[in-house]
């Protein structure tokens, strides 16, 4: 497990029987308004690491400004990189209370910002998913409609083709067959009757010619 991290600009706590306050980083000397007895009663605040970084910066770069304006000293231990951080506030009791109140107000503000951003992202995801669902439904519906139209048009075209074949085939063929049959029958009948009629006509004529001389005598 990694050792607790201390920001480079934070006050080093005085150990029991110990040594005067040592200020690290950007604070090279002790504050004139800070007294060593303030180290005995720190106020402790626990916050999520990401909130501490939002308030004081990732490396604690805003802490010197807060300390100078509030006349307090701040020590931060990051207990768990993904969990909580411990903030110790040293100074006059009234200044401690004001500083802790300010820290908690800033924490609430950043929580609200994160919740708002998460809610906006969630709403955007829902809207995107809804739009995709509607688009898929429209595409499926249009594909089904187009398929129905194609099937209906194919059926109609097939019916027209069948009707045209039936209409053109039956009446024309029947009429042509009937006409041809009538002509053949008439021709045959005429061919068969002509020799008989001619023979009868010749016979009748010879008979008449045979009677005429007698009648004339």
Curated annotation (Swiss-Prot):
It is found in: Cytoplasm; Cytoplasm, Cell cortex; Nucleus; Mitochondrion. Induction: Induced by hydroxyurea and etoposide. Residues 129-217 are annotated as: Disordered. Changing residue 201 to G: In HYDM2; uncertain significance. Its main location: cytoplasm. Residues 156-170, 177-194 have a biased composition (Polar residues). GO terms for molecular function: RNA binding; structural constituent of cytoplasmic lattice. One of its GO terms (cellular component) is cytoplasmic lattice. Transmembrane segments: none annotated. Expression appears to be maximal in germinal vesicle oocytes, it tails off through metaphase II oocytes and is undetectable following the completion of the oocyte to embryo transition. CDD domains: FILIA_N_like. Contains an atypical KH domain with amino acid changes at critical sites, suggesting that it may not bind RNA. This is KH domain-containing protein 3. It comes from Homo sapiens (Human). The lineage of its organism: Eukaryota, Metazoa, Chordata, Craniata, Vertebrata. The gene is KHDC3L.
């Amino acid at each position: 497990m990694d050792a607790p991290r201390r920001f480079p600009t934070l006050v080093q706590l005085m150990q029991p029987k110990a040594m005067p306050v040592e200020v690290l980083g950007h604070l090279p000397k002790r504050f004139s308004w800070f007294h060593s007895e303030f180290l005995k009663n720190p106020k402790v605040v626990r916050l999520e690491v990401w909130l501490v970084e939002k308030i004081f910066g990732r490396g604690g770069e805003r802490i010197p400004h807060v300390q100078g304006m509030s006349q307090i000293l701040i020590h931060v231990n990051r207990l768990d990189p993904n969990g909580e951080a411990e903030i110790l506030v040293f100074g006059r009791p009234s200044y401690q209370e004001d500083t802790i109140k300010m820290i908690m107000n800033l924490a609430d503000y950043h929580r609200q910002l994160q919740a708002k951003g998460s809610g906006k992202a969630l709403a955007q995801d829902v809207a995107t998913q809804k739009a995709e669902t509607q688009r898929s439904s429209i595409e499926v519906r249009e594909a089904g409609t187009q398929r129905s139209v194609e099937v209906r048009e194919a059926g109609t075209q097939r019916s027209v083709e069948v009707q045209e074949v039936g209409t053109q085939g039956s009446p024309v063929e029947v009429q042509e067959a009937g006409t041809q049959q009538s002509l053949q029958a008439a021709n045959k009948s005429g061919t068969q009757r002509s020799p008989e009629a001619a023979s009868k006509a010749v016979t009748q004529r010879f008979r008449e010619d045979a009677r005429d001389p007698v009648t004339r005598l």
